Amino acid sequence: MPSFALLLREFALWPLCLVPEPILLLLGVYKKRKGPSSKIPLVLLHGFLATNSGYLLLKWRLEQQGFQIHLPRLGWFAQEKIEVLAERLAQDLERNNIKKCILLGHSTGGVVGYLYAQQHPSSVTKLIALGVPFSGSPLAKIAFFSVTARQLIPGNPFLRRFKGPKPFKARAYSVMSAQDEVVPLSSARLRGAKTVRLDGLGHLELLFSHRTVQALGRILGDHNS
């Protein structure tokens, strides 16, 4: 169970994940890729009712380590089916001429990434799931008004696809925490994926903690080779 102090930290981080896209555009967050690169880009996929602002610190930290980052603009994940979001991701990557990539998805973003990897297996070299509800989240019931959230209510037929062997060859990693107040450990586990435990961190803290950066560094260590 998450502590009261952890919940306070999560509440304080929440606004950092909600900066509107127009402001991110003004800040120059979405810079166009300059020509071809020998590096495989790391594509960051945000979660439900969030924007790419939650990834800005992690993006900066990873760029300092030499990784090439791409932030697709997929919307708020509220009134669209996750299958539609995966197709939108495919269109974004095609538009940006990204033929191969590493996908890192937080929460619902990881579900979107899984579907993309399933549909485009030759395009994904690694899939990294950061607090992803592969078996759903009990809190999804609170957001019953959302088409996206309803797909993530435990027991929804949509979630059956995550029960069997992963339908792609890319290596998969599931990063999770026992103190994640949104995604229980049992839901974050993915068959065929290597489990990485970062206990003590909340759902949003997974985006901001230096421990996450260290874990990602180990996972991504050879992605440019």
Residue ranges of each PLM-predicted region?
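Catalytic histidine-centered segment of alpha/beta-hydrolase-like enzymes
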Residues: 80-81, 202-210
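Serine-dependent carboxylesterase/thioesterase catalytic core
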Residues: 42-53, 57, 61-171, 182-183
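Short active-site-adjacent structural elements
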Residues: 182-185, 205
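A hydrolase-biased, glycine/serine/histidine/acidic-enriched motif that marks catalytic-domain neighborhoods
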Residues: 155, 160-161, 175, 198, ...
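Catalytic histidine neighborhood in serine/cysteine hydrolases
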Residues: 70, 191-205, 216
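Flexible, membrane-associating and regulatory peripheral segments of lipid-active enzymes
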Residues: 1-42, 51, 55-72, 95-98, ...
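Short beta-strand/loop motif that positions the catalytic acidic residue
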Residues: 174-176, 180
